Amino acid sequence: MTALKNDRFLRALLKQPVDVTPVWMMRQAGRYLPEYRATRAKAGDFMSLCMNPELACEVTLQPLDRYPQLDAAILFSDILTIPDAMGQGLYFETGEGPRFRKVVSSLADIEALPVPDPEQDLGYVMDAVRTIRRELNGRVPLIGFSGSPWTLATYMVEGGSSKDFRKSKAMLYDNPQAMHALLDKLAQSVTSYLNGQIHAGAQAVQIFDSWGGSLSAAAYQEFSLTYMRKIVDGLIREHDGRRVPVILFTKGGGLWLESMAEVGAEALGLDWTCDIGSARARVGERVALQGNMDPSVLYANPAAIRAEVARILAAYGKGTGHVFNLGHGITPEVDPAHAGAFFEAVHELSAQYHG
């Protein structure tokens, strides 16, 4: 086991003392970086990049090489690898985003879906995790991730992205038995997939419930949170002599933090619509918090970025249990220098809140 040179991120998730607030950024390996665009061009297309462990490793490390302040790496992959491995036929349409050649519309469709084996069916992801861990050589921890069952189900039922989730919600209310069967199979798949990533070397994992906030409060409890709890219950929580923290992120889930805090994850991700000080008052005794700057702040000048970082740090207050991040992923049009100003500000301005 390679010793971690920087374990600030893991310590904050476990609410252990840190010198400064750790920072990383969702989609930190992405289109805003010219070096990422060059590697993607070399790969040919997005899925070819995801499925090449060496190139996935290359783009995972690019932001760390550019920004020495980053306290974690996140596996470069896509949340839709699981449905693709179930035989749904993932492809990307220019300007349309992800699409599936097969759509799930009945209980018979769901019963025919396999639960993918991480090494057999998603070996390229496990190989990428192993390659990244080797190349990181203990520089920072590596985060693995998956989409949540509800979020994956929406893509599988809709056949791709959706603005209104018409088919998914129709199935949820018209045929809850079918939706529960799909979510249960996805929960098994996600548990197996994340455990595979942990075995391969992921030192923390995040569940992205990107579309949980589209649900009513009652439907969120029944059709999203229930299945994330099943996953958390089934995850490997100790590996290589260390706790493997779990981060739960429901975009639009700010009203439900108390319920989310009961699931057993070490941390909750917050989107930018939450006040982090209020969130800490509500659930900070039970969980660490990750977030939550509006990604659009990165379009502003470095002084404005710094001011917003200062505001969020002050809102959280003194002590550990905060991982600074955006409230969602960085957008492709952001100037890379502005991301650098963000990371620098977090470390420079947060020292006063620790020690």
From Swiss-Prot:
Protein residues bound to substrate: 27-31, 78, 155, 210, 328
Enzyme class: lyase
Gene Ontology BP annotations: protoporphyrinogen IX biosynthetic process from glutamate
GO cellular component: cytosol
Localization of this protein: Cytoplasm
E.C. designation(s): 4.1.1.37
Sites annotated Transition state stabilizer: 78
CDD domains for the chain: URO-D
UniProt keyword list: Cytoplasm, Decarboxylase, Lyase, Porphyrin biosynthesis
Keyword Amino-acid biosynthesis: no
Pathway this chain belongs to: Porphyrin-containing compound metabolism; protoporphyrin-IX biosynthesis; coproporphyrinogen-III from 5-aminolevulinate: step 4/4
The keyword Cytoplasm is assigned to this record: yes
Reaction catalyzed: uroporphyrinogen III + 4 H(+) = coproporphyrinogen III + 4 CO2
Known role: Catalyzes the decarboxylation of four acetate groups of uroporphyrinogen-III to yield coproporphyrinogen-III.
NCBIfam families in the record: hemE
PANTHER family in the record: METHYLTETRAHYDROFOLATE:HOMOCYSTEINE METHYLTRANSFERASE RELATED, UROPORPHYRINOGEN DECARBOXYLASE
Record-given protein name: Uroporphyrinogen decarboxylase
Record organism: Pseudomonas aeruginosa (strain LESB58)
Lineage, broadest ranks: Bacteria, Pseudomonadati, Pseudomonadota, Gammaproteobacteria, Pseudomonadales
